[in-house]
Amino acid sequence: MKKIYDLWVRVSLIKKIGIGVVIGVMLGILAPDLTGFSILGKLFVGGLKAIAPLLVFALVSQAISHQKKGKQTNMTLIIVLYLFGTFASALVAVLTAYLFPLTLVLNTPVNTELSPPQGVAEVFQSLLLKLVDNPINALATANYIGVLSWAIIFGLALKAASKETKHLIKTAAEVTSQIVVWIINLAPIGIMSLVFTTISENGVGILSDYAFLILVLVGTMLFVALVVNPLIAVLITRQNPYPLVLRCLRESGLTAFFTRSSAANIPVNMQLCQKIGLSKDTYSVSIPLGATINMGGAAITINVLTLAAVHTFGIPIDFLTALLLSVVAAVSACGASGVAGGSLLLIPVACSLFGISNDLAMQVVGVGFIVGVIQDSCETALNSSTDVLFTAIAENAFWKRKKA
């Protein structure tokens, strides 16, 4: 028994989730009457629902409070590229959702009533009101817009705090992240239960829907990595970007694909920047910063799954509302850094714009975890490789201006 336990501990989480998916499918086909097994999935999603608001608040406030004043480098352009790249990724995801509309199979209660917004004006009004919600109430009711706004305000206020206070905030963020890690480590069991419930209630044919969802997610990320990012690079450097793009994907993206953490890939990215010959004063700041705010892959995940939920519930959406969703997704994605599956936990932020309840949004998160074996790896690979790419092209443009 101990040997089995030791073997299980040594197996990576991504392999455990894969095993869980296979077992869940088999149980759903062979023993669909084990309805009590569904409670494990409900407990897993419940744990995520409980910790998600606190996670967003802790990470965002800690990140803002610890930001340092940049040296005389090209950090301004890098930050602009990070933010623009994340927004561009979110916008591409919206366009993809229009071209390839998805629907999800969710356990929607019969008496569920949705309150879809009537155009962008109502969405914007709702957004403003949520911004000023009581911070305690925002955490308790999972008002993620309010949580984000208060986290930013607290982070800015804490910039002037003592080192001891900042250390306490950092410790609180680390503790919250550790709790999330513990919950995420239960993902194989939770996902096994979620897959079992889905198969036992809807049949094997439901897997084709998830296959299409994976194809849309991965296809969108590949389009951003191989078309959008090179286009941005061409506009900045006026040079063929593909040798650099492919090197970043090969030497940074490949490692990030398996670690599934932008934060864990920081040393790899710094070593790559050194190999390329970039300034240490620049990349020592830009790479850790990119692991926090350069979240194009996360923005894609948030938008694709949110709009899939919108299509599932038949909620009408105009282009201006979709544009606002892109902005919200880009801002929300900044809170996903360094946490496995972090982008999935931020889907309720975007869902709340369309009157989708937190309970239903967390079901969408559950779907995200089922496809997360591939989605999270591809997302992290895109996020982390783009950190090096944008740092390199910004420095290239910086030295061109110096020579001119």
Curated annotation (Swiss-Prot):
Cellular component GO terms, alphabetically?
A: plasma membrane
Q: Which PANTHER family does the entry mention? A: PROTON/GLUTAMATE-ASPARTATE SYMPORTER, PROTON_GLUTAMATE-ASPARTATE SYMPORTER
Q: Which GO terms describe its molecular function?
A: amino acid transmembrane transporter activity; symporter activity
Subcellular location(s) of the protein: Cell membrane
Q: Which GO terms describe its biological process?
A: serine transport; threonine transport
Membrane topology recorded in Swiss-Prot or TrEMBL: Multi-pass membrane protein
- Tell me the superkingdom of the source: Bacteria
InterPro entries referenced in this protein's UniProt entry, alphabetically: Na-dicarboxylate_symporter, Na:dicarbo_symporter_sf, Ser_Thr_transp_SstT
Give the Gene3D superfamilies listed for this entry: Sodium:dicarboxylate symporter (1.10.3860.10)
Q: Does the keyword Hydrolase apply?
A: no
Summary of the function given for this chain in its UniProt record: Involved in the import of serine and threonine into the cell, with the concomitant import of sodium (symport system).
Q: Which reaction does it catalyse?
A: L-serine(in) + Na(+)(in) = L-serine(out) + Na(+)(out); L-threonine(in) + Na(+)(in) = L-threonine(out) + Na(+)(out)
SUPFAM superfamilies cross-referenced by the UniProt entry: Proton glutamate symport protein
Q: What is its main location?
A: membrane
Fetch the NCBIfam families from UniProt.
Answer: PRK13628.1
Which residue windows are transmembrane per the record? 17-37, 39-59, 75-95, 138-158, 179-199, 212-232, 287-307, 313-333
Ordered alphabetically, the record's keywords are: Amino-acid transport, Cell membrane, Membrane, Symport, Transmembrane, Transmembrane helix, Transport
Name of the protein in question:
Serine/threonine transporter SstT
Family label: Belongs to the dicarboxylate/amino acid:cation symporter (DAACS) (TC 2.A.23) family.
Q: Does the keyword Cell membrane apply?
A: yes
* Upper taxonomic lineage: Bacteria, Bacillati, Bacillota, Bacilli, Lactobacillales
